[in-house]
């Protein structure tokens, strides 16, 4: 019997965050907390099923599921691939972090972790993919129509006012003037998109309300600012304090090269004077909604806050952008968050429009021609 350094018998148990699927006639088991995958033959799958709780190696060997000559090597391999945990080793911190999402797992935890740190294809690679495959890949229809149903035409909208103007003017910009934005402009955009406007007396604790909706008023979204060229603010990485309406400096300025790493495939966004990251503190939502569907609330809420951010920037005549193609772990390392309890979900930024340009949707070249829809 194998014993730990303290002389105690070593116990093993199946890892708590495993998802299995058949692929190419092989069962593959994925520990989504550690990101490690392994092919598992039937006899080893049966061995794992015996380890629902801490089990001694002696009892496991006695089950006869694996030939005695291969037993020790099999256990070592399962531990190395993080499919088994040993009682004499410290828990992996990633596993402990994923445990905090327990009531959402495996659905939300698996989706959250397996969609991080994606390798994004360059636009030119996507355009050439159909040619490489020997077939044309046509895009789906841009709109949906019911051809066999009656449609009632609506009156034209009353599109007067500042909000309607901002909604119509909002565009994604990919080129920016070298002029800085002002601290007043940044403060206005942050206050009216992410700042706490009022506190409501709740049964247990005061409840914050912002300009964007949040399921159960949980307001799980946090905002971080990467200030690169703001008149009146030292370059650096800041956390926005929504109640105090202030910026807390948490790290030195990111280099331009580092900022480009944040947005793989969209490096031109790093030229903006300000980049903003929207994260979610999942515990706030979990406290009230212990079912996996509530993970969607975190995604939607980040979108609400970001849209408010973009509209406020547009109303001030600034050039905003938003992007979801992110280098998650690089960003989270620089923000000092673990990516599980609190994770980056979305990014945006603001700059000034380049001189003489009505819209710069492309990193270089002229903007495409625009045809306005006369119905709206």
Question: Where are each of the predicted segments found?
Answer:
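Glycine-rich, charged/polar anion/phosphate-binding loops
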Residues: 5, 13-16, 205-210, 225, ...
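C-terminal helix-cap and adjacent tail motif
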Residues: 343-376
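Residues forming anionic-ligand binding surfaces in small-molecule and nucleic-acid pockets
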Residues: 147-175, 279-291
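Short conserved catalytic/interaction loops centered on acidic-Pro-aromatic/His motifs
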Residues: 288, 313-341
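Glycine/small-residue-rich phosphate/adenosyl-binding loop
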Residues: 214-305
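Active-site pocket-lining segments that scaffold enzyme catalytic pockets across diverse folds
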Residues: 183-232
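Long, low-complexity, charged/polar intrinsically disordered regions in eukaryotic proteins
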Residues: 1-35
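Long, charge-rich, low-complexity alpha-helical segments
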Residues: 23-26, 33-157, 318
């Amino acid at each position: 019997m194998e014993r730990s350094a303290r002389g105690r018998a070593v116990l093993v148990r199946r890892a708590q965050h495993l998802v299995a699927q058949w692929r190419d006639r092989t069962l593959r088991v994925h520990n989504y907390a550690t990101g490690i995958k392994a092919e598992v033959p039937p006899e080893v799958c049966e061995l794992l099923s015996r380890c629902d709780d801490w089990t001694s190696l002696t009892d496991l060997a006695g089950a006869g599921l694996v030939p005695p000559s291969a037993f020790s090597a099999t256990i070592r391999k399962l531990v190395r691939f993080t499919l088994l945990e040993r009682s004499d080793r410290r828990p992996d911190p990633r596993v402990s972090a994923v445990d905090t999402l327990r009531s959402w797992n495996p659905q939300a935890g698996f989706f959250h972790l397996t969609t991080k740190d994606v390798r994004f294809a360059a636009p030119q690679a996507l355009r050439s993919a159909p040619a490489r495959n020997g077939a044309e890949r046509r895009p789906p229809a841009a709109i949906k129509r019911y051809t066999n149903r009656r449609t009632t035409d609506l009156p034209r909208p009353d599109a007067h006012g500042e909000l309607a103007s901002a909604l119509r003017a909002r565009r994604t910009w990919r080129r920016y003037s070298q002029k800085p934005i002002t601290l007043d402009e940044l403060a206005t955009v942050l206050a009216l998109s992410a700042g706490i406007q009022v506190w409501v007396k709740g049964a247990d604790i005061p409840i914050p309300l912002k300009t964007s909706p949040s399921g159960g008023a949980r307001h799980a979204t946090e905002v971080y600012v990467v200030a690169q060229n703001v008149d009146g603010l030292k370059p650096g990485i800041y956390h926005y304090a929504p109640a105090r309406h202030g910026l807390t400096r948490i790290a030195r300025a990111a280099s331009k090269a580092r900022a480009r790493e944040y947005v793989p495939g969209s490096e031109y966004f790093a030229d903006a004077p300000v980049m903003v990251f929207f994260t979610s503190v999942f515990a706030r939502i979990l406290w009230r909604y212990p079912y996996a569907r509530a993970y969607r609330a975190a995604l939607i809420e980040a979108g609400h806050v970001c849209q408010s951010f973009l509209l406020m920037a547009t109303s001030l005549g600034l050039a905003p952008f938003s992007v979801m193609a992110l280098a998650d772990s690089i960003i989270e390392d620089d923000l000092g968050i673990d990516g599980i309890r609190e994770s980056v979900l979305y990014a945006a930024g603001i700059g000034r429009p380049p001189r003489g340009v009505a819209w710069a949707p492309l990193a270089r070249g002229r903007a495409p021609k625009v045809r306005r829809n006369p119905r709206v």
